[in-house]
Amino acid sequence: MKKNNGSFGSIMLILGAVIGAGLASGQEIVVFFARYGFVSIIFAFLCFILFAYGLYELMKYGKFKQKLPDFSKKYKNNFIFDSCEGFIFLIFSATMIAGAESLLNEFVFKFDFKLWSLLILLFAVIVSSNGLKRIIKVNKILVPLIILSTVAISCLSFFFSPHSDFALSFDLSNLAFLGVSATLYATCNLMVANKITIELGGKIEEKQMKKIAIFSSVILFVIIALIIVALLVNDNSVLFASLPMIYLAFMINNTVGYAYSAIILFCIFTTLTSTLYSLSQCVNTKVKSKSFSMILSALAVFVLSLFGFDSIVRYSYPLIGALGIIMLFTIKNRTTCEECSCGQNSCQLK
């Protein structure tokens, strides 16, 4: 990877994949954190630790594949592992298209019209087809704007929208559920960025890995914590909205609402380019034509997106989180000295 992309480009690539429609709209935050009350912020920090550790392990795995040809060849085609990866990227890509559909139909155009989601999918296909470098270039522009806008909406909501004391709860009875929820959310997001992070690991300096993992995770934690607070201190109806942060933005001001709707579309696009790229890479292991792999992936994504945004997030994401735990343990196991067969007390990659 070129020096000018550096750590900043890598962090923006990872965050662009993770901060999709589900996170920036608040829907994921309600499902995994905010519905349990104010104490969920503590568990968002647990998510930060797990996410940072997972990112580092994924990048290290990418370095193994790049430095050890025999290691890469050994795990090149694993049907079960590859199928799980493909399923995960299909779900995430479909969620982004369904999120775009929900956003445009409910808050912007007020009617059901598939053309907009098809256009977003088409643009994502064009960018994804040009590889990781093009995705990084796009993310370096869009992701800082997404982060600043999400932080701004969260902060503005403290001053310009009706508040409620109902959600300001420190209910400790949900601690067990929150622990599981935070773990699932961390692994869920690691799965979104799984393929691109592994590929990234093979292209960056080893000394950059920890810095990229920590900074990406800190930014993610700050965004999650701010969204949790914004959702909990505002009107009770916010938690029950299909796109809570959009709903909150419109409560502040109609202009703010429409502006943030555009930001959510950027979120959808950055995540979709990463997940669609990853999905086509999975399909490409079985279908040798890269172009046909991309077309096949895009068609599958569009069909699955017809099930709707809310249904996909509520029922598929926890399952993906559970799958993610198994896959991360598999990756961790592969990167032990026994697996790389170096026959030394310390791994040759260190």
Predicted regions and their residues:
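Transmembrane-helix boundary/entry motifs in multi-pass membrane transporters
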Residues: 2-5, 34-39, 61-90, 106-113, ...
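Extracellular loop-to-transmembrane helix junctions
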Residues: 4, 8, 30-56, 210-225, ...
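Hydrophobic, membrane-embedded alpha-helices of multi-pass small-molecule transporters
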Residues: 5-24, 40-44, 85-89, 93, ...
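Small-residue-rich segments of transmembrane alpha-helices in multi-pass membrane proteins
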Residues: 13-19, 40-44, 73-86, 142-158, ...
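Hydrophobic alpha-helical segments and their helix-loop junctions in multi-pass secondary transporters
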Residues: 21, 90-93, 97, 145-171, ...
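Juxtamembrane transmembrane-helix boundary signature
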Residues: 43-72, 229-230, 234
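Extracellular/periplasmic helix-exit of transmembrane alpha-helices
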Residues: 55, 184-185, 216-248
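Membrane-interface loop-to-helix entry segments
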Residues: 100-104, 113-119, 127-158, 313-331
